[in-house]
Structures are given as structure tokens and as C-alpha cells.
């Protein structure tokens, strides 16, 4: 998507757009160390499960590329075992940045597996480093292609469902939660990619999206992406989903995922469960769109998904452009962070994610296809799409 990206690379340099400042200021931050990548992920300067996995993989690759070019060579390149110890330490560290998003763990495990295979193959340290660099870059590069695949799968499946109900010529209204587009991935997006595909093929009537408080990924990021793409869209407060379903003809809800369990239970941005319950009440198809790497077959159901809780302060403040809008000497919109609650609240409940049970989900889409539940069953068999 021209002009919108979460990560850009050039001549070995990695930069991310600081998503905390969007949509009013576009600022790129250079990421040159593992520690900087960890901080960027944890502080949500970059977010979206696929995007943070790409950043982690690219940062490891960049770290090793610089090591191979260094003179003198760093001590961890002395032997395969010293390299293995060094890299495994970094992989373990960066994996702690956000515990719920399984894509981050999948990326670090993938690099760890390549590391182990290369060591067992008897390669020297420099050759092993080259293997890891290639794998890190591949993790990032393959994301866009699979996003387009899953977006097409999901859109075509949805159109088939409505065609079977006699609405083959109708354009669709689709609601989404949070941000799952180019800013959450390496490009195109997952659930927002499905919406984009419908728009590109002339089958979207209108996109609807929740603000997704307290970080406002919807009102800040999804709004920005849809506006950039000239996709007709409407924002709604998180508490207005039920009203929307009562008063508008919504044909589907499409959401992303940070972790999908073996039975189809899905962790996603907090507020997704609310939307799923309301969609079920109104018999609106509820679709999860995510890459295969988001499916965690080691976890049987949602009760075992670790749920990240963010600092209480993040639910008490909001950041944005001053209104009426004014610019500084450099022509940038002036922004401020303001507190919207009384100071010193005794209790703030601020989970970053909730879990939607499989029974409320109509279909799960990956780059390999679409899974639905068998008649009479409340959980999924995901073997066909992983």
C-alpha cells in the first residue's frame, strides 16, 4: 500500500513508523539493536501480531549482518556454540515483549530451529549466521503474499455465503475491530485485507470499524488506512456495536487474531468478544482472518491463552492533535496527552486482549483456506488450514 507501512528497510537499516503518533504525525524510528526492537514492541510503537514478528526477525538478521561485517569479529562468532548461546539469549529476550501474540513466538522458534539445524549440520559460525539472516528476511517478505491469499479466501467465501441466500449481486457492509491492515502487518493486512479485497473487486458497500479503546487502534490507525485507500467507511464507538447491528444491514464481522487455539478459540483485541456475542445474537457471520503462524496447536482452548494486561495509566489518558488544530514551527500538528479520569483511581481493569469462544465464530481463514465447524459441533477442526 503506497504511503502506509509498519516497517521499511533500506541498505541494512530498519525503520518503523511510530504508531503512537499516528494519524497526525508520521515519524520513522530507526531500530538498530535488539533492545530497541523489544522496547518498540512492548511500548506499542509497533503493534499487530504479524508486524512485531517481522520486526523481531529483521532485527536479529540485521544484528548478525553487522556482526559479519565487523572488524574485529565479535566474540560470539568464535564458534557455532558461542553463536548459538548468543542468539538464543536474544530470541528469548525479544519473545518476552508481548506474551499473547503467538506470531512473535512462532518467528523466534523458527529462527531457533534454523539455528539448531545449522549447528547439527556442522556449519561454522559465519555460515550459521548467514542462514539466520536469510530466514529472518524471509519471515518478513512472505507476509504480504499470504495476507493477499487469506484476504481473497475470506472474501470469496463470504460472497458465496450471501449468494446462497439470494444476494449474489449485493455489495456488503463489513465491520471490523482494532487495526489489521498494512500497519499491523508487512503489507495489505488480514481482516482489513479482506475488506480491501472486497473494495478492490467492487463488492464492498461500506466498512465499519470500532474505535478500539483505550489505544484507539481503530479511530487512529484503521481510519487512517481506510481514508488513504479511499474506502467508504464509518467509525463507531465500541459501545455502539449493538446499535449498529440493530439499525444497519451488516453482512459480516471480520477480525484478526493474536492467537488461535487448537479448537478455534481466538484471542484478539479486547472488545472482539463483545462484538462476537452481539453478532451471534443478530445472526451475522463472524470471521477470523489470520496467518497459519497465529494458530497455536499446542494450546487446546482459550483458557490457557496468556492474556497481557497493560498499565492502568494507558486506560486513563488519550493522545491526539490539539483542537482546533494548530501547527508548530515545522508545520507539524501539535499533539498532547491528556488525562480523562480522576487521578489516583483505586482500580483499573485493562486487559489488552479477550478470548472469543469457537462457538461464536462462523469461519476461520488462513492463507491455506477457510475452516468452518461441522454440523452440530461448537469447535473447529483446523487441520485443513494449517
Swiss-Prot record:
* Matching SUPFAM superfamilies: NagB/RpiA/CoA transferase-like
Catalytic residues, per the record, are 258
Give the domain of life.
Eukaryota
Localization = Cytoplasm; Nucleus
Transmembrane ranges, per UniProt, are none
What PANTHER family does the annotation carry? METHYLTHIORIBOSE-1-PHOSPHATE ISOMERASE
Task: Report what the protein is called.
Answer: Methylthioribose-1-phosphate isomerase
| Organism the protein comes from | Postia placenta (strain ATCC 44394 / Madison 698-R) (Brown rot fungus)
